[in-house]
Amino acid sequence: MSEDIKKGLLGIVVDETEVSKVMPEINSLTYRGYAAQDLCEYCRFEEVAYLILNKDLPNTIQLRKFEKEEKNNRELSKDLYSILKKMPKKAHPMDVARTAVSIMGLEDKETTDSSPEANMRKAIRILAKTPTALAAFYRLRKGKTIIKPKKELNIAENFFYMCFGKVPQKEIVKAFDVSLILYAEHSFNVSTFTARTITSSLSDIHGAITVSYTHLRAHETVVH
């Protein structure tokens, strides 16, 4: 009987995903059928985020609406800012993100609503608020005052602004935007499996993402 045990889930196929496909043998990564290389060249991160959530790239009106909703939800509550200020300065940013998303779940007015429509709205709020929380903690650990988000800036530009008080050259912003796109989705990896396991028990989206962050914490070395 012990021979049937798959250690560490090795060889276990849990499900399939249509969101992305990783093909290392040909150095290929696709999101919803679009090559990541093309998305990096022709799209911004906001468009790719919309693609992942909605299964297709947005038209002009859809993108404008999506960006407006994201920008309108960037600000954090006073309580969350207060919690960030009390966190140890040596805390790992992934741990900060995990805790911040957990608090967002406590505060979200739709926490108990797990309908597809509510989950979409909550996903956009998490997308909007998480960079604000990370940038705020970055400033706090350096002994600097928090810089609030600017609606006039896109996600990549705004993150630089909240961290450093200014937006760098376009080439640097583009490089960061490309990085956001390339790390946006990587098929049915461990963090996705973790989130799917949590949601299968009918937990809320904030709980699933909070737990999946514990896996991402272990993969920081990939960025380096």
Identify what each model region corresponds to.
Residues 1-217:
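Hydrophobic alpha-helical bundle cores within soluble ligand-binding/oligomerization subdomains
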Residues 215, 222-224:
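Single conserved hydrophobic/aromatic residue that forms the stacking wall/gate
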